[in-house]
Amino acid sequence: MALSDEPAAGGPEEEAEDETLAFGAALEAFGESAETRALLGRLREVHGGGAEREVALERFRVIMDKYQEQPHLLDPHLEWMMNLLLDIVQDQTSPASLVHLAFKFLYIITKVRGYKTFLRLFPHEVADVEPVLDLVTIQNPKDHEAWETRYMLLLWLSVTCLIPFDFSRLDGNLLTQPGQARMSIMDRILQIAESYLIVSDKARDAAAVLVSRFITRPDVKQSKMAEFLDWSLCNLARSSFQTMQGVITMDGTLQALAQIFKHGKREDCLPYAATVLRCLDGCRLPESNQTLLRKLGVKLVQRLGLTFLKPKVAAWRYQRGCRSLAANLQLLTQGQSEQKPLILTEDDDEDDDVPEGVERVIEQLLVGLKDKDTVVRWSAAKGIGRMAGRLPRALADDVVGSVLDCFSFQETDKAWHGGCLALAELGRRGLLLPSRLVDVVAVILKALTYDEKRGACSVGTNVRDAACYVCWAFARAYEPQELKPFVTAISSALVIAAVFDRDINCRRAASAAFQENVGRQGTFPHGIDILTTADYFAVGNRSNCFLVISVFIAGFPEYTQPMIDHLVTMKISHWDGVIRELAARALHNLAQQAPEFSATQVFPRLLSMTLSPDLHMRHGSILACAEVAYALYKLAAQENRPVTDHLDEQAVQGLKQIHQQLYDRQLYRGLGGQLMRQAVCVLIEKLSLSKMPFRGDTVIDGWQWLINDTLRHLHLISSHSRQQMKDAAVSALAALCSEYYMKEPGEADPAIQEELITQYLAELRNPEEMTRCGFSLALGALPGFLLKGRLQQVLTGLRAVTHTSPEDVSFAESRRDGLKAIARICQTVGVKAGAPDEAVCGENVSQIYCALLGCMDDYTTDSRGDVGTWVRKAAMTSLMDLTLLLARSQPELIEAHTCERIMCCVAQQASEKIDRFRAHAASVFLTLLHFDSPPIPHVPHRGELEKLFPRSDVASVNWSAPSQAFPRITQLLGLPTYRYHVLLGLVVSLGGLTESTIRHSTQSLFEYMKGIQSDPQALGSFSGTLLQIFEDNLLNERVSVPLLKTLDHVLTHGCFDIFTTEEDHPFAVKLLALCKKEIKNSKDIQKLLSGIAVFCEMVQFPGDVRRQALLQLCLLLCHRFPLIRKTTASQVYETLLTYSDVVGADVLDEVVTVLSDTAWDAELAVVREQRNRLCDLLGVPRPQLVPQPGAC
């Protein structure tokens, strides 16, 4: 085994962290057994080659990583895998690179299965000791490429240390020559272990395992344990956790000491325990920033504490059942359902002295419970549980009391979390006696709802999760009669956590704890019914929990009031606005389960909270008041009673005064004013829907003022909450108008109608875009009786909002909301013959269509990107809604040319480049096509369209995926009516920036053109449409630049080769003229580069077109931008080599030489001379300098 050769290349293990949704393993066996055997069999062939070696290593790593969650499936295969790899290691002829590779594979297996399981498979005969020791000795600790080799060899050596023979028997004669003695095996192993305890790689962990196995041997502990412990304590004393080397040294030493005090016999370790504890105190590890050092310190402290105490099972502990399954079954056959817990009043060891070091150990463990890192707290909690199990009952009870002290609101969330973990450990081990359950359950119930706001986030998720773990542990630890007094409180708390907790992990933990209690205790009310609804997966969706599952559980009377109380007490004032809104909506649902309780107990509390100085409490309570009032109205309405039958006069007056109280206290101003406005708008909406007896009251004027003021000042509201505020105000206005502004059935109060319509129409001309948005939607939300007689005036105002003018070209959002308002008004007033001021009819439908179709060409862009998308999307939706409305009522109002324009515009949008927008357009297109109640009249090419887009394919096609959308949409190019618009959309997609969009749109277009190559008429029609698009969009860079790129693609691909057989083909002549106009005087680099490519491709057309194309290229060779000159020269060079017939063979070499040898980014005077020379060679006239106007 030539391990002293150069190490093979390799890197440390790769740990990929997947941040997406993780899928649990569901494997049944090691399915890659044959592949793995073949992979290991090829190691001798691939170890030398870099690429093959890395591929084999990576493939093996991928295979093994699949079993990271189910490593036990590897157990039947571990032995043959290890044998194959160790055969390589033990083969004397194996080169060093192959041996290192074998150890890398061994390490990967160890990483997945764990070294403890893997260790027993290593050969551990007496004959293996020296060869393994020799292998370790020749390793280079500084070789960073072979750390896996050292790690595995140290583990192997730790196994060989377990041989039941004295190591001195292996030494033989230590005197090799007179005066020279070689080291004994015992000394060599100890030296190696000590040297690797202070290295910086993974071998340090293996060295700690080696030390623990070696030092605790009977023949080694007598002579080496004291020496090693002295060396270790000196290392700890000299090292500082403030330096990197100090951290490494302390880490290795602490690991070794912790392992020794774990595996060593108590009588061997006890003499040194106090000394080690004193040294550990001096290290001040709790002050270190290194989590691992603090964790190892806690681990070592608890092992020292366990060394101080005799290993015994506390006779006073609480026991449920028996460890023996046979004993438990025997109890059942005797008719006993439970075993009484055994509590001795006298403990045989009660009088034993507890060593003084125990108190210091427990003190340090209690400090560890409050550590800032979870791993340290968890280790301390387990230490508390282990120590308490060996203490007398009185002292263990003191420990429990100290743990309960962690649950003070002066303590941090870290202390609460550590306390929960410790209680769970104590309960799980039967060390929490039933007499303590009253105190423990009280703090656990608090921990289940622990949630503290800290800055911009909250803390407490881990506390609530650990509290669920405590409940889970108690279910397994105690008999049902012990927990019976607490069943109601625990079950309600767990249900509340499972349904109303903000964090998904806590909801799932609570659900699991509830399930454990139902299964093991059997005393939770309606446990099985609740579990089937609130299972692990169901509680994953927060909205579903708050709004659906909560209603089901509240149907059981034991849980109804606790759930409502929790929402009012904790969630209505929660720091997260989403939780407050969900809590209010949940109260709406639960109020219908307990109307009397909600009206008499909950509602007064909520009303008192609306005046709280706390912003979150005010916001949540106002929302809750609105929702509960509306819920009570629904109940009353079912019996044709008013809501006042549930709410007394004091409650009604309290609701009415909320707005005025907030206004008087100026709480509508500032940052908090946003929340207050939104909440009161919801209140207005719900109270209006609840038909509160406020008609004619001054509060209506106050509500109207708030709605108007909110809509007028939307631009002052933060952008992230603006949409929610706008929606709330508009919804409030709609409900308010419907309930309080109707004078007679179907008739509006004329004064109010005049004031509202006039004021809102005036605001549509406001210079603030957001104000226009708000009042546009407000007009759209007005009920029909307020629009009666003023419809034409309102539509005219909204059409003006949708019109793009130079002053408001960037107001895309106001145009979008104006379109939405028009569509909503049409739905409100309906379609019927009559005056245009009453409903949609023949006199105004064309004007509405004109406004909607005009917005289909809105391609406004600003710093936010293509904001015109919002307008076009709203226009398509509005067109669909209006057309379907007309088709249902009066299809004769849909004119043929209007329907054609709608379908063509929507088809164009369905072929453009933005994925989600293309999907929406396709949805609209197919909805219009397949609508059959009745069918929409005048759809162009309906028969062909239904064949191209059958109803059966609608659900299966993902139009947002370019690979599925473009092959289908390009089929419309064969229909003359749609060709222009679809080709226009495709051009924009094909010349875009997204790789997948470009690829699939290009492929689809080429497939279509390939199909029409044999049809001159179809090809001519297509080329004419392409030129028409170019002509219509000349100097429109949104279209012209992508069009030039498209032309480059189709010309390069030979789509128009049929035209090259004719000199000066009309297509080529017109295309050349349009390209010249497009790039003339342009400074757009992208446009010029695309133009160069097109001119180069046009030299394939014979005749004057070729000469003119070459002339344009020669002009570009002297362009003012050096980049353009260089690119032109490069592309002309390639073109002349591609189309060899363009230049005569006698001058081709000279032309190519000039193009390649000239520095085209040099001064123009130099470049111009070479350009003129090229003109002469190519046979085109030399360009002449045109004097600038006014030049002297």
Swiss-Prot record:
Disease affiliated with this protein: Encephalopathy, progressive, early-onset, with brain atrophy and thin corpus callosum: An autosomal recessive disease with neurodevelopmental and neurodegenerative features. PEBAT is characterized by early-onset cortical atrophy, hypomyelination, microcephaly, thin corpus callosum, delayed psychomotor development, developmental regression, intellectual disability, seizures, optic atrophy, muscle weakness and atrophy, spastic quadriplegia, and respiratory insufficiency due to hypotonia.
Protein name: Tubulin-specific chaperone D
Organism field: Homo sapiens (Human)
Pfam family, one: ARM_TBCD
Disulfide cross-links: none
Keywords: Cell junction, Cell membrane, Chaperone, Cytoplasm, Cytoskeleton, Disease variant, GTPase activation, Membrane, Neurodegeneration, Repeat, Tight junction
Family per similarity comment: Belongs to the TBCD family.
Induction statement: Down-regulated by shear stress.
Molecular function as annotated in GO: beta-tubulin binding; GTPase activator activity; protein-folding chaperone binding
Gene: TBCD
HEAT repeat feature ranges: 361-399, 557-594, 596-632
Subcellular location: Cell junction, Tight junction; Lateral cell membrane; Cytoplasm; Cell junction, Adherens junction
Result when mutating residue 1122 to L: In PEBAT; severely decreased protein abundance; does not affect localization to centrosome; decreased interaction with ARL2; decreased interaction with TBCE; decreased interaction with beta tubulin
InterPro entries listed in its UniProt record: ARM-like, ARM-type_fold, TBCD, Tubulin_specific_chaperoneD_C
Biological processes annotated in GO: adherens junction assembly; bicellular tight junction assembly; cell morphogenesis involved in neuron differentiation; microtubule cytoskeleton organization; mitotic cell cycle; negative regulation of cell-substrate adhesion; negative regulation of microtubule polymerization; post-chaperonin tubulin folding pathway
Expressing tissues: Ubiquitously expressed.
Record note on quaternary structure: Found in a complex with at least ARL2, PPP2CB, PPP2R1A, PPP2R2A, PPP2R5E and TBCD. Interacts with PPP2CB. Part of a supercomplex made of cofactors A to E. Cofactors A and D function by capturing and stabilizing tubulin in a quasi-native conformation. Cofactor E binds to the cofactor D-tubulin complex; interaction with cofactor C then causes the release of tubulin polypeptides that are committed to the native state. Interacts with ARL2; interaction is enhanced with the GDP-bound form of ARL2. Does not interact with ARL3, ARL4A and ARL4D. Interacts with beta tubulin. Interacts with TBCE.
A cellular component term, taken from the record's GO annotations: microtubule
Record-annotated membrane-spanning stretches: none
Function of the protein: Tubulin-folding protein implicated in the first step of the tubulin folding pathway and required for tubulin complex assembly. Involved in the regulation of microtubule polymerization or depolymerization, it modulates microtubule dynamics by capturing GTP-bound beta-tubulin (TUBB). Its ability to interact with beta tubulin is regulated via its interaction with ARL2. Acts as a GTPase-activating protein (GAP) for ARL2. Induces microtubule disruption in absence of ARL2. Increases degradation of beta tubulin, when overexpressed in polarized cells.
Result after altering residue 937 to R: In PEBAT; decreased interaction with TBCE; decreased interaction with beta tubulin; does not affect interaction with ARL2
